[in-house]
Regions:
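Contiguous beta-strand/loop segments that form the cofactor/metal-binding neighborhood of enzyme cores
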Residues: 52-55, 240-241, 250-499, 503-517, ...
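Structural recognition of the beta-strand scaffold that forms the well-ordered cores
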Residues: 74-77, 128-131, 178-179, 201-202, ...
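Extracytoplasmic/secreted proteins, especially bacterial periplasmic and envelope-associated proteins
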Residues: 81, 85, 122, 136-140, ...
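N-terminal glycine-/serine-/threonine-rich beta1-alpha1-beta2 phosphate-ribose binding loop
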Residues: 2-14, 19-199, 214-226
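Alpha-helix capping and helix-loop boundary segments enriched in small/acidic/polar residues
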Residues: 156, 180-184, 204-211, 230-233, ...
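Soluble non-cytosolic domains of exported or imported proteins
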Residues: 132, 180, 233-236, 475
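Non-transmembrane alpha-helical segments in soluble domains
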Residues: 19, 87, 91, 139-142, ...
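Hydrophobic, small-residue-rich alpha-helical packing segments that form membrane-like cores
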Residues: 174-178, 194, 199-257, 262-266
Length: 531
């Protein structure tokens, strides 16, 4: 935010031209002059209010120049929708993807996916190892490793396919791995990778169960590898701005937080396409279901579960680990909440009667008695009426996305409370009006840059598809992978390190446990157990 000045040459020039135009309308002119002066005073008051209240910091710059740093060899384990996005974040996309997005950019000026990808920093790494249990995806990952259309030009080397992840981990030339498998494989692969000395980027949620989270945490701490959990929201500029606002006390004491999810499409409810080439010859089903508590033979049901795994607790964590985890981690980033004392949740399968066992309507309550705070989460997969997220304080409320109505992605507004103690004098004098925000953060344009599907728009509104640095549109997944690689090279901790990853994993496990058992769950930090 620029500093405000009482003297503005352009304003003075506008005023002179305005007054000159009113010279021939004496009666109305006097009224409008008074109105002009009042509006100018109000504008100045609001400007002074913001400079008085908000001590704003700039977002971190996009630091480039890794060409002289250590070259890293990475492997990908699980090249599905999320895995392919993370590999693009590292600088590797399939030829089919680059060809399609290039054509889309020519036909639609708002579609900036290709330009955003090509303007990424070259992260000075090579994709050298691929493991996926579906032949089609494994071949796509190899194609991505060899595609010359990428930031930095021709890749140094291509990838080799491994049938089992342990074979990939045995390659001593691989420095780090991205784990983007279904949730039920996260803990095994992460633990084995850490024991093999590989750094790990693990997609969220960290684990499927609470016990797995404990094992992953202990192994990462013991081995000393660098772990980044896949919450790219840690790179979203709006969250950093929101933290600044809250740390400065603009909201006053905060006692209630409301987080929401609204989707209304089969895709948004994880009813994903069953690939026509998926069969017993192209899919290693036995390996896929190896860690799951319940096993079934390969067939039509197995195909559904392989491609729509988030619909079953055998493989995923439902709304808790998939969607709530994003909003919780963002709020944890903003407010340093940590693990709640109590968690309770309820819901049901009310709309998608397709054999799934995870709910499509789900609510959770997290209680922080030591912080005098309760967090509520409400989700439905059968209504697209976006409600946004609210952080409610005694003096003001922050609304992020959804109902903030700021016309941009990843933004927020702060509106004063009528009964505020902090703003009482300003409210009484009219300097602050509860109908208007006292602070608005609105990055980028009012367009949803080429995003068309409801699910993509949901992620865009959460700031998970792109963010801004120095006015430049950047993929937060790219920034998150970069943060991980920079931390590996520098021996530092990434933004979503094992400590905050553990907080997310335990919190989501508590909420899931409450739903499955129908009881309130308590966290015992001293003994590291759920009661």
């Amino acid at each position: 935010m620029s500093e405000n000045s009482n003297q503005n040459p352009s304003t003075d020039q506008d005023r002179r031209e305005f007054l000159k135009a009113l010279a021939t309308v004496p009666v109305l002119g006097l009224f409008l002059v008074n109105l002009w002066q009042k509006l100018s005073r109000d504008k100045l008051k609001r400007a002074n209010l913001l400079s008085d209240l908000v001590q704003e910091k700039k977002a971190p710059a996009v630091i480039s120049g890794l060409s002289d740093s250590k070259h890293l060899n990475i492997g990908i384990i699980g090249y599905g929708g999320r895995g392919s996005h993370l590999v693009r974040g590292a600088g590797f996309a399939t030829k089919g993807w680059t060809d399609a997005t290039y054509e889309n950019s020519k036909n639609n000026k708002l579609d900036k996916a290709f330009a955003t990808f090509m303007s990424q920093e070259d992260l000075n790494c090579s994709l050298v190892g691929v493991c996926d249990l579906f032949d089609v995806r494994a071949n796509q990952a190899i194609d991505a490793s060899q595609n010359e259309v990428r930031p930095g030009g021709k890749p140094k080397k291509g990838a080799v396919r491994y049938r089992h992840y342990k074979e990939l981990l045995a390659n001593m030339n691989i420095d780090a791995v991205i784990v983007a498998t279904p949730d039920h494989w996260h803990s095994r692969i992460t633990i084995d990778a850490a024991k093999a000395g590989k750094h790990v980027y693990c997609e969220k949620g960290l684990t499927r169960t609470f016990d797995e989270a404990l094992n992953v945490y202990d192994t990462v701490k013991r081995t000393g590898i660098t772990l980044q959990l896949g919450h790219q929201n840690r790179q979203v500029e709006a969250n950093e701005k929101a933290k600044q606002i809250i740390d400065q006390g603009l909201l006053g004491p905060i006692n209630l937080i409301e987080l929401t999810t609204n989707r209304n499409s089969p895709w948004g409810a994880w009813v994903w396409t069953i690939h026509p080439d998926g069969n017993s010859k192209t899919i290693d089903w036995d390996t896929f279901q190896e860690p799951s508590p319940n096993k079934i033979p390969f067939g039509e049901e197995a195909l559904r579960r392989f491609f729509r795994w988030r619909c079953w607790y055998d493989y995923g964590t439902g709304l808790s680990g998939d969607l709530f985890s994003h909003d919780f981690d963002a709020t944890n980033q903003i407010m340093d909440l940590g693990i709640p004392k109590y968690a309770s949740s309820s819901g049901g399968i009310y709309f998608y009667k397709d054999g799934r066992d995870v709910p499509d309507v789900w609510h959770a309550t997290l209680e922080y008695p030591e912080k005098d705070l309760t967090l509520l989460y409400s989700a439905t997969l059968s209504s697209n009426d976006s409600r946004g997220n609210r952080i409610m304080g005694h003096d003001a409320t922050m609304i992020l996305g959804g109902q903030s109505n700021i016309g941009s992605v990843g933004g927020f507004i702060v509106t004063a409370d009528q009964e505020s103690t902090q703003y009482r004098e300003r409210l009484e004098s009219g300097v602050i009006n509860t109908k208007y925000p006292i602070y608005t953060y609105s990055p980028g344009s009012k367009q949803i840059d080429g995003v068309t599907s409801a699910t993509s728009q949901y992620f865009a509104n959460k700031g998970l598809l792109y963010t801004y640095r120095e006015g430049k549109r950047v993929d937060p997944s790219h920034l998150h992978v970069k943060d991980w690689l920079d931390s590996i090279r520098g021996g530092t901790q990434p933004k979503c390190n094992i400590e905050v990853a553990f907080q997310e994993a335990v919190t989501c496990a508590m909420a899931t446990e409450s739903y499955l058992t129908g009881r309130r769950v308590e966290w015992d930090p001293k003994n590291r157990r759920l009661i």
